[in-house]
C-alpha cells in the first residue's frame, strides 16, 4: 500500500507546515506497527495559471495508477474519525494504494470529483486549502491512534 497526499500549492515555512510535518511524523510512528506506510506528500503547483482544470491534470498525473482517489470537498460525505479509521484499515487490508487529494483555493474540478472513489468533507464550512492539509494530517494520525487503541481519540 502506498499512501499519497496530493495537495495543490506549497506550504511555506511556518506554523501550518510545522503542524503538517508533526502530524505526519506522528502518523508514521504510530502507523508503522499497524502496517500503514508513511504518507508521501506531493505539493503540486500550476505554474501556468490554468485554474482548477490544470490543477486536476496535475493531481491526476500524481496519483499512483490504480490508487483509490479520495478527494476533500465540501460536498463530500462527512465522516466521524472512527469511520475514517475504518476506511484507512480497509484500504490497508486490501493493499490498495490511496491518494488523498486537496484542491487549490477554488476547489477541485468537477471531473476530478466525479472520478473519485470517495469524496469526504471536513464539515459544512469551507476551509482554506492550506488549513485542510493540517486537519487531514491530524485526522490521519487520529485514525492510526484509533486503530492502535491509543487513548488519543476521546469521545
Curated annotation (Swiss-Prot):
One of its GO terms (cellular component) is cytoplasm. S-adenosyl-L-methionine binds at residues 72, 103, 122-127. InterPro entries: Alpha/beta_knot_MTases, RlmH-like, tRNA_m1G_MTases_N. Keywords: Cytoplasm, Methyltransferase, rRNA processing, S-adenosyl-L-methionine, Transferase. GO terms for molecular function: rRNA (pseudouridine-N3-)-methyltransferase activity. Its main location: cytoplasm. It comes from the Bacteria. It catalyses: pseudouridine(1915) in 23S rRNA + S-adenosyl-L-methionine = N(3)-methylpseudouridine(1915) in 23S rRNA + S-adenosyl-L-homocysteine + H(+). The keyword S-adenosyl-L-methionine applies. It is found in: Cytoplasm. Its EC number is 2.1.1.177. Belongs to the RNA methyltransferase RlmH family. Specifically methylates the pseudouridine at position 1915 (m3Psi1915) in 23S rRNA. Homodimer. This is Ribosomal RNA large subunit methyltransferase H. It comes from Cereibacter sphaeroides (strain KD131 / KCTC 12085).
Amino acid at each position: 500500500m502506498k499512501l499519497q497526499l496530493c495537495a495543490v500549492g506549497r506550504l511555506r515555512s511556518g506554523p501550518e507546515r510545522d503542524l503538517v510535518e508533526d502530524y505526519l511524523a506522528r502518523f508514521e510512528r504510530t502507523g508503522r506497527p499497524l502496517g500503514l506506510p508513511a504518507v508521501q506528500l506531493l505539493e503540486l503547483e500550476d505554474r501556468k495559471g490554468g485554474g482548477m482544470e490544470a490543477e486536476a491534470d496535475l493531481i491526476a498525473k500524481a496519483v499512483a495508477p490504480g490508487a483509490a482517489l479520495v478527494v476533500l470537498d465540501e460536498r463530500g460525505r462527512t465522516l466521524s474519525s472512527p469511520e475514517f479509521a475504518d476506511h484507512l484499515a480497509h484500504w490497508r487490508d486490501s493493499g490498495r494504494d490511496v491518494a488523498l487529494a486537496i484542491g487549490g483555493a477554488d476547489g477541485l474540478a468537477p471531473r476530478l470529483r466525479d472520478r473519485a472513489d470517495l469524496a469526504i468533507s471536513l464539515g459544512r464550512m469551507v476551509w482554506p486549502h492550506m488549513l485542510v492539509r493540517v486537519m487531514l494530517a491530524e485526522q490521519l494520525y487520529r485514525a492510526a491512534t484509533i486503530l492502535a487503541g491509543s487513548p488519543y481519540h476521546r469521545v
